[in-house]
């Protein structure tokens, strides 16, 4: 197969002695046949004939003029005047025409000047010529013509015509849209019943056709097509009989077959003898496609042809030769007409119409070899015309073209010009010239090596940062410049420990397969030589399914108003191994895994919030399968999950509700294979304006990380194999993306009153859960509430239509489910599924540590010792049900004396506050936990150690300060609401006066409380609610009186008969009309429960001091 032939580029040296021309003894002498030889070699010839083609030299060698055009290219001194003796009948006019023609050739040769090197060998790519390689080849042919001899003049005229025709093609290409070339070409091919299947598949199909017919056998079209399809299917499954039949039709159209017709049967096709090699068959195939393009009026450059048909740039000369052979005398004139049409379409800004007379003159030249020799005047006119059109092309490319010479550059790849060219080092010149993919100078080498570092393929910025957040690697600030990824072999990830950091990095023990898909195919190397903040060498190998495995911020707009993340922050992870704690960190900082809330301003909560030192910050990333969300009708309201008895949620800015479908127990599979990737971890996708779980942008600060751990269920997914998440079941999985907040919500300067109430409620829930001691989790108490709360026991906020259907499956806990108890007691399940939960650290990987950690600590309190029965190796043993514990088989012990003592406090109290005993160890709502530093590596704590830890003062101070700030915000929002209330009442009064009837707002059904609450508590709560409602009513009355308005009968009855003047507008903004009452009731319930608990972490005065009772609205 012919490839790029570089011989024509050695035009500055003698082809016999291979020495560079000079002006002394190696003067270049051009012969009539078009070859140029130095004068020394020419004098050594035995006969007066060209040594290459044996063409007779008619003129005396001493009378042949020196090629001055080549001399000026090698930098030699050009003789000013040469004594030229023309034919005997030539006069002074002919000599004048000859001199003009020679000067035209010398001027055109100057376009080849950048191609010459100091030694005169090959090309120099550092100063690339403005002309394309086909133009350069044709120009070299013209320069080698000997104008003195008759044959040389004929060749010069043909070269001038060819150069002019190529100039027209170049101008047409400059006016074409390259994006439409391929589509127009394949449309023209398909219109003729043919097809091109792509470079690789087309080559295989042609080779299979040749394999079937190269021995001269005759096959019918149907048999030939079936043979090719059967052989192509293993490698190209998309091959079909129709497509292969179109390829055969293309060869049939190219007359490659000898067809034998048969009566009443299909014809037999036999490959012609001249096409029984692949090179010949492929050349005819390419010629047919080029001919179809020419018939369709398409002008395609050789480099474009090489890319289209072969997928590379090494077949340009092959395609150029095909184009040249397909040129006809009429094609030049047709090209001039096409150029005229293109200029009319574009308006001809460069005034290229002035070239049309010269182009028509060149088109009228007879290109046949038998044409009569031109006169000296015709030679002069032709060369002047070609000089004019070439100058016009160069001027257009330099001044008016949008492409310039960039289209001549080969496509850059990862190693483009990153090594020195061997020919340039050894010979001092490269025959490939500008198309060489190797560097020709040290400056060029360094330039492209630097560019190659920046051109390493990587993910988009948001995806890259999201991936870095998932694997817990440092992220640089936006102004750090380009991110370099030096090619180096990354090291492995031994046992989940990321090496190279000052603090041991840990990876979550969650059995979520989406997170494992991030770790397994990716080999991290934290110690790369790139700058701090640059990403590691893992972006290309990370599967796309892991992009949403760790949702950090469900609302990307929430981080726009936050300060940028410092570069020095080390974002750490918690591993799957047995190493549970970083050795020396003073504080542990946990991230809210439920996503940030609406984009509040960070200022209201910035004052008094404790931030740990940067050197020991450890932000855990949590894996949670995204739930199947059902979008409500009011899509832009901020709905929040209400506080339930076994779930503690607290976040710094409020957390949006995760809206789940109803949980149907029949949906669960018998076992959950943690090695399979379920669709719950699918990558985020965008559908119109609906966006879900987009990665954290670059400006994600630590301020958005809540110091409170939310409940999560991934910690015990191996145990929960009996009852898996509905989001992990593919047949019944349904995903609805979150709806982005509208602009008016994103510009909200302060949190709303509802959000502040919810925030206060969450803080109260934190304090409540921190001070209530629960009974042992494995005691089969009949009063344990079902984890799936019936609808009548849920708060009113759960009953919003469209927001919650059934129950929130994130409330599910295997320990509170009735049917799970028998499985815990069986020994067989200990060694299989249940044992997956035996290796539970106190590392708080997810929010599940609120109850799961205590289970683990109670179990290990009675263990005889470490690794006494199952001494496994260093690496974790993983079964298809999860990690196998490295501890003894005494997984679940009967409750000890301390547990029995705790169980005596009553089932009603324990059922509400279950799984919240060891919040001081779990890091629920405080960033500083000194107990972490005292824990052994395997997490073994005695019961006495756990119960003797009081609630840290810093945590209470933080909660108290935050609660004060929330109360201040509530007061501010309440004042704003009151102003709106007064205005709405005025409007309602006018409407009622017109309609003489006003429909009161629908009364909400009274809140149904769990039956476990005592009557004494209810009476106290009602008393406090009455005081609060009276205070609220007086404030509203004073506000109404100040605005000269009377109170309206828009009231809402509550359980005790008091009136609360809440207008319609207020009820429509809150999820239900009694949101304030519920908030107050919840806060009072929390304070009452805490005050009656004798074994809480602090007494009543402590609760008052930490802000528990200061919950009344101002």
UniProtKB/Swiss-Prot annotation:
Residues 999-1008 have a biased composition (Pro residues). GO terms for biological process: 3'-UTR-mediated mRNA destabilization; cellular response to interleukin-1; nuclear-transcribed mRNA catabolic process; nuclear-transcribed mRNA catabolic process, deadenylation-dependent decay; positive regulation of mRNA catabolic process; post-transcriptional regulation of gene expression; protein polyubiquitination; regulation of nuclear-transcribed mRNA catabolic process, deadenylation-dependent decay. Residues 941-956 have a biased composition (Basic and acidic residues). The keyword RNA-binding applies. Residues 918-956, 994-1017, 1031-1051, 1087-1114 are annotated as: Disordered. The RING-type zinc finger is required for proper localization to stress granules, but not to P-bodies. The ROQ region is required for CDE RNA-binding. It may also be involved in localization to stress granules. This is Roquin-1.
